[in-house]
């Protein structure tokens, strides 16, 4: 169990590092955020089963729902930005400009 938790923690940290390194492209940032959410979902599920906290069994499902909503909003934002600006560079965006 310890090796699985360590692997999932390393996967979460790698995805977090990817968010910090690839923050200039929106698509790469969204993929790294999805990796973070997936590793967090699996880690929460394994910890709940391991410690027999069945009262918290809905928490991973709620996290998965929010992750799906985040992915949908992120992809809609990516499509909108790509159609208006022609690329997904976050550096070229000025959010104060309408």
Curated annotation (Swiss-Prot):
<comment type="similarity">
    <text>Belongs to the complex I subunit 4L family.</text>
</comment>
<dbReference type="GO" id="GO:0045271">
    <property type="term" value="C:respiratory chain complex I"/>
</dbReference>
<feature type="transmembrane region" description="Helical">
    <location>
        <begin position="25"/>
        <end position="45"/>
    </location>
</feature>
<dbReference type="GO" id="GO:0005743">
    <property type="term" value="C:mitochondrial inner membrane"/>
</dbReference>
<feature type="transmembrane region" description="Helical">
    <location>
        <begin position="57"/>
        <end position="79"/>
    </location>
</feature>
<dbReference type="GO" id="GO:0008137">
    <property type="term" value="F:NADH dehydrogenase (ubiquinone) activity"/>
</dbReference>
<keyword id="KW-0472">Membrane</keyword>
<keyword id="KW-0496">Mitochondrion</keyword>
<comment type="function">
    <text>Core subunit of the mitochondrial membrane respiratory chain NADH dehydrogenase (Complex I) which catalyzes electron transfer from NADH through the respiratory chain, using ubiquinone as an electron acceptor. Part of the enzyme membrane arm which is embedded in the lipid bilayer and involved in proton translocation.</text>
</comment>
<dbReference type="InterPro" id="IPR001133">
    <property type="entry name" value="NADH_UbQ_OxRdtase_chain4L/K"/>
</dbReference>
<keyword id="KW-0520">NAD</keyword>
<keyword id="KW-0813">Transport</keyword>
<protein>
    <recommendedName>
        <fullName>NADH-ubiquinone oxidoreductase chain 4L</fullName>
        <ecNumber>7.1.1.2</ecNumber>
    </recommendedName>
</protein>
<keyword id="KW-0679">Respiratory chain</keyword>
<keyword id="KW-1278">Translocase</keyword>
<keyword id="KW-0812">Transmembrane</keyword>
<dbReference type="Pfam" id="PF00420">
    <property type="entry name" value="Oxidored_q2"/>
</dbReference>
<keyword id="KW-0999">Mitochondrion inner membrane</keyword>
<dbReference type="InterPro" id="IPR039428">
    <property type="entry name" value="NUOK/Mnh_C1-like"/>
</dbReference>
<keyword id="KW-0249">Electron transport</keyword>
<keyword id="KW-1133">Transmembrane helix</keyword>
<comment type="subunit">
    <text>Core subunit of respiratory chain NADH dehydrogenase (Complex I) which is composed of 45 different subunits.</text>
</comment>
<dbReference type="GO" id="GO:0042773">
    <property type="term" value="P:ATP synthesis coupled electron transport"/>
</dbReference>
<feature type="transmembrane region" description="Helical">
    <location>
        <begin position="1"/>
        <end position="21"/>
    </location>
</feature>
<keyword id="KW-0830">Ubiquinone</keyword>
């Amino acid at each position: 169990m310890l090796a699985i938790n360590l692997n999932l923690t390393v996967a979460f940290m790698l995805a977090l590092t990817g968010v910090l390194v690839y923050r200039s492209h929106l698509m790469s940032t969204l993929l790294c955020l999805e990796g973070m959410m997936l590793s967090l979902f699996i880690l929460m599920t394994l910890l709940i089963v391991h410690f027999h906290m069945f009262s918290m069994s809905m928490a991973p499902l709620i996290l998965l729902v929010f992750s799906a909503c985040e992915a949908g909003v992120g992809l809609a934002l990516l499509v909108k930005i790509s159609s208006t600006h022609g690329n997904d560079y976050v550096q070229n965006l000025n959010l104060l400009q309408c």
